[in-house]
Each structure stands twice: as C-alpha cells, then as structure tokens.
Amino acid sequence: MAITAYDALTERQKAPKVLLINDFAISSSSSSPPFFNLAATFRDNIRSFLREYAEIEDYTIDGATVSTIFLGSQANGVVFPLYIIEQQISDSSPNPLCDFCRCFGWGHHYVTKRKYHMIIPNRDEWNEPLKRESLTLSSHLMHGLIHCNGFGHLLCINTDLDDPNHLSGDQIMDFWDRLCSTLHTRKISLDDTSKKGAMDLRLLHGVAYGRPWFGKWDYMFSHGSFGVKKDLYWRAILTLSSIEVDKILEELSGTSKGRVMKKIIDFYRGSTESPLATLSDLLRFMLGFISKAPIERKTAMALVAMSLDHVSYPTLRADENSEVCTSPDQESDDNGYESGRDTVLDDHNTTTSGIKPPQYYSFDDLSRREHSRWPGRRLNDAAQAVLKVFKERNSTISRQDLREAVRSSIGDTGLIDFLLKHIDKVLIGDQIVQRSTNPKSRMLQFSLRTINSRVQEQKRKKKRKVKPQETSECTSTTPGLSPYDDILYLYQNLLLTYPDSDLYSEASQVILKCKSFVKEWSYQEQNHLTVSCQVLPNHEELLRDFTRLLPPGDLVAVPENATIRELKSAAEKVLRDTYCITETFEVLEIRNRYLEKLDDNVSLKSQGNTEFMVKGFGLDIGTELRYEGGFDDWTVDCKCGARDDDGERMVACDACKVWHHTLCNSIEDDEAVPSVFLCNMCYGDSLRSKKRNLSIR
C-alpha cells in the first residue's frame, strides 16, 4: 500500500525524514523487536534518536522543546507524527514532580533533570501545534512519559474507529513497545482502565487468557488498590478461569438466565471441535470468534443451526465502539444513548427527545470513575461557573464561546476541557447540561435542561454497589450474530454477578481492583559492561534526610576491561547528568553488594557482579527536587492493608495525620469528606479520654 502523507507533512518547507515501520503489527513474541539498534542507555539513546530523526518545531510549551518525528505504517499506508516534548526540570518548572510516580509506588525515586512526553495526537489534530493542555489530555491516540533515567509511564492508548485509516489499539501498542525497546527504557508502568464497550478488559482478558490485555506485551502485575496483593490477584484469576462450563449449566438450570446461557454455550460449543470445558476456554474462543469475518460467522451459525434447534434469546445490547486507554487521567467520550436506562429527563420549555441520561450523580463519582486529575470539589466549582454563564445568557452556547466565557473564572484550561467533555454525564442539582451538534455548523454546542422529580428520586435510591441491570428481559437476537453481545451477557451475569455465589463475585472485584501493571526491560551492550550504581548516602544523611527507601541504581556502561577507577568517573558523569540532587555529586568510592570498599585498580569484570553502591559527597539535601513523590513525608495505613498511595481517594486523620481510603471508612464516592475526620484508632482514643474525664468529675 502506498504511503499517504498528511497535510502537515506536505506543508513543511524542508522534506523531513520518515521512519518506516516495516513490521507494524503484533510480533510472534510478546516482546516487540526494536526499530534499529542503539547501543547505549535511554538517557543517551533518546538524544541520538531526536538528533537523527526529529525536526524541532518553531514553538515551545512552557519553555520545553517540541520535536516531531514522522513515522510511516506499511500496515495501512499512514504517515503520522510522533511529538516528543523535552522538559528540563528546575525549581522554576511548572510541574517538576511526577504524580504518576507517586501513585505507582515510585515516589521515592529522585527527581530527574529531564522527562520526555511522547504523543500521537488524534487524527484531526495532526495539523495543529500542541498546546500546554496537550500534556494533560488523555484523549490522544498515544501518550507516554519517560524520565531520563529510563523509568516511565504509558498514560493512554486510544483508537478512532471513525477514521478509515485508523490505527488499531494493537498497532499503537506494538509501536509503543518497539519504541521502548529501541530506546532501552528500564521500566514502564500503566494504569489499566481499558474497556471493550461496557466491559473492563483487565477482568475479561484476565479470566480468558490469565493476563490483562496489556499482558500481550509482557506487562505484569505490580500492585493492587485497597491492599490487594499479588497472590490474592492470581487466586482470583484462577478461581474464575477454572469454573467448569457444565457446572454453570447445572447450577443455572431451570432459570431464565440458565436458558439463555445454555443457548449461548451450545452455539459456541457447536462451532468448534475443541472442548470448551472451563469458563476460560469458552471466553477465549468467543473472543477469537469476534475476529472472524462475517461470512465465517454466518457459516458457523448455519452449521450449528443444523444440529441445534434454531432459537432466539434475550441479550443486552451495548455500544460496540472499542476504546483502549490508560493513566490516572483517562477520559472517555461516549455520546451514544444507553438503552435500558429508565431515567427520564423533562424540560417543559424544550424538547427532550434523545437526551442522554446522567451516568453519575455527583462530581466525586465522575472524578473517580473517569480518572480525573481534579477532585470532585474542583469539578463542582467549575460546573457552577458554567451554570452562571447559562443564567446570564439564557440560550444555547457553542463550545468555543462557553469555554471562553468561563476561562476568566476557572483559569485552568485543562480543567475546562475535561469538564466540557463530561459535564453532560452529571446531575447538577435539578439540571443537566446537554451536549449536541449544531446541524448547520456541525460545531459542538451546549444547552441547560431541567430534570423532573423522578430523577431526583433515583438519585436518593442510588447505592454504592449497583448490580448490573438484569439482562433477561432485553432485546432478542441469535447466538453468534453479535459475539460481543454474547460475551457481554456472560460478563454481566457470570463474572460480575454469578448467581448465589459471593466467592465468584468477590474474585471479580479483586481483579477489578488491580490496575497497576509494569514491564521491565533488561539489556547488555556488546563489547561493554552495563552495571547498576546505587547512591548510598552517609549514615547521618540516611537518618536525617533520606528516610525513604533508596531509589534503584542507575545503569552505567563502561568498556569490558574497565577498572573501578573508570567506573567511578563514568558513574559520576551519569549521576550529574540524570538527577537534580546529584548535580554536584562527587564519587569517592565504589562498594560491592556486601558494602565492601573496592580498590581503584581492581578490574570491574573480575568482580562477577553487576550491582554496586556509590559513596561520595555533594548531594543537594537542601533542594525540594529530591523525590518524585514530593518533599513531604506522609503515611498511609488503611484498614484494607494499603501502606502506600495507590491512586484511590483518601482522607487524612486530623489527629494522627495518617491517610486512609474514604471507601474503607464508609465515605461514599459521592459524599464530601467530613470537616473533621478521625480514624478508628484515634476515635477510640478520643472516646476513652472522654470517659476518663467523666469518671474524674
């Protein structure tokens, strides 16, 4: 297929280089091959990559250099841009610390001197320059952030099915994996909130394949939220994946769900000669059935119909648009009307036909479920500014006009964009803001509608754990006609709410609480030794200034015949180039894993070891750019077992200052945190103190 260049490429005065992706598809192994060989660590490779292939743009973002690399996909003939924004970190940087490191458990890492945003924007933004808010949006086709020490985060992966030349989620993910392999990244984290329509892929693929969707690229379990550990996660996977299909049919026989389930299972069992003995076998085959060509599915349906009674069965219809995304800031824009909801909107002054019912009943709920980087309180304050504009104008307002009208009172354009994208999903008192498209200009516009008392009644009855809608009364269809609907039926009625079994439902919740996954790369340069050098502060500094876990060592490449003296020089150069706190650090000695000091003239290779400790002086203990998680020490000790920030909503005890999950303390997501909060221990101490005072009196 011929390469199709987009407008931004052809408008360039100088023809830029195009990096052709010859194998832009899933490779046979789970680890994708590099584009080409770079023989250095990430901090050096990223510089070489930019120097060789990138074109520097004529604008900056908050002083950060923006470069563009053009890539050509031979899979679908598309040339697309990869923007790389290099942020130099200093005390004056707008966002020098990393919230993603803090939430992932890397808050003890030293603050790096450079970090690189790697962005493939949406297709309709390829001709536009990036903006400041581009660094916080999660609607890009791809957005990754990598620190110059090689640790990074995959923030989002999205697909645009409306684009005929769209890049699939698998293609984008394969590109990202190969890019990381090429540049020699060390570890990449991600927050897995990927979905297929209404289904969480980490649950669906976890049961079907024993791994999340990202597991195809070797992303492995890191830690769970709410204190979930690795062994509990794997037990939950095993519990659900090993459910026997015959047991399901037996336990549900005689029920309406059982009859529907049997028709689905009989069809797919009749479509293969392989025994579909377990739920894992069944779901894996059904997921493969989706990828078959329509003619193959129709043939299978005809063959099965010859051996089975042809029946229709009820199932739940759902949006079949696929979206795969990740990060603490993920956004999803689904404007389809969800049939089956019984929420009624009512505005006596305007028509309400086709208005989408609200998905959330508070901004706290929206903030949590849409993974907003802004708390519910800020979203609510911003929404009030939007309502004020509607009250002043009393008319339908275009998106651009509304955005400009609230900028003076809100200021944060990223917050404005996020709110306008999701505001139609939330009730604001007895009103809701409707998004629609102007039929003439085709531009997005907003209007304010009033809802009736029935919605308010639904809001009062809404509980935290809302079970999925019963699906036995929904639209009829035929097994195999829509494999997605067949899978969704099993997902809703087996994985989420297995009848009369708390064991299986709890196992599903354990898997859903596990969103943090990580991939680690390892490599060794040819004709060089690559060793890890970890800074070891002196005893006084450890007691006074470096109370957290020491960050991992940095990779240092030296010749194979290097001595300890040469390693000292190379390590000092690497540390000064990488971290703010080691900018003036001088290496005095190298120690082995047993903390034994090594002589300068000793051959490095003779040590038979690749991990060393580095001691010296010159650590900048006065800088606030010490830890990626921030300068302040704070303690998490929740009753669920969590001992670190896991990205979930928390509240600090006003007495002991220890942080706890709000949900673990009966504070619902749509509830405000009380003005005074005491944890169970401090509350008990307070009661005992009051009793003592009363007894003394």
UniProtKB/Swiss-Prot annotation:
Region (Disordered), start-end ranges: 319-362, 457-478
SMART domains linked to this entry: PHD (SM00249)
Keywords: Metal-binding, Nucleus, Transcription, Transcription regulation, Zinc, Zinc-finger
InterPro entries according to UniProt: Zinc_finger_PHD-type_CS (IPR019786), Znf_FYVE_PHD (IPR011011), Znf_PHD (IPR001965), Znf_PHD-finger (IPR019787), Znf_RING/FYVE/PHD (IPR013083)
Molecular function (Gene Ontology), one example: zinc ion binding
Keyword DNA-binding part of the UniProt annotation: no
The protein, known as: PHD finger protein At2g01810
Species per Swiss-Prot/TrEMBL record: Arabidopsis thaliana
